[in-house]
Amino acid sequence: VIIPPKGGHGFNAVQELGAFFVMTNTSLEGTESANSGDVSVANDFRKVCLIKDPKSGGSAANAATLRATKAIRLTGISGTFAVDEKITQSSTGAVGKVVEFDSTNSILYYVQTRHNDEGVDSNGNQTAFSGANVVTGTGGAQGTPETSHSATTNNVVFVSGYSVPEIDHDSGDVLYVENRAPITRAADQTEN
């Protein structure tokens, strides 16, 4: 005869199992295009994080995947923007770094950092890319933001040619961080 604990087995799993740790496992499959295309194969990655309660637009984020990059829909493109290339908008003083360039949809995905105080105003605030001002890469590529484009393209929502990240920066609690050697992705690749 097995005598269950008060409330039955599974009533209080933490107490019954004596658990203090949780193990998780996930797989990154190709570009995840069946979901949203948020997992790019255009760039390598070195860090995997688990974030508790991230926000999206000030509310709880509930999507399966979220893109943390900003994006610009370009027109009149000359040249090709390269991954990790510095981009600038001289008329505004904005500076960024290319994460991915989707030449099919004319979308430039980028991030802005404060590591070297480039692209910040006198108060230390980042200067945003804005308007129909030409964006130039250090390799010579150029494009003009398509400010008349306010639509969803490739699962990215644009307003006047610009898209904000789907996750609010500095939101949520970092529960786990794993630093890895650089992993270069491919469309037919799965990481565990």
Regions found by a protein language model. Give the residues of each.
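Interface-prone segments of viral and bacterial extracellular assemblies
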Residues: 1-192
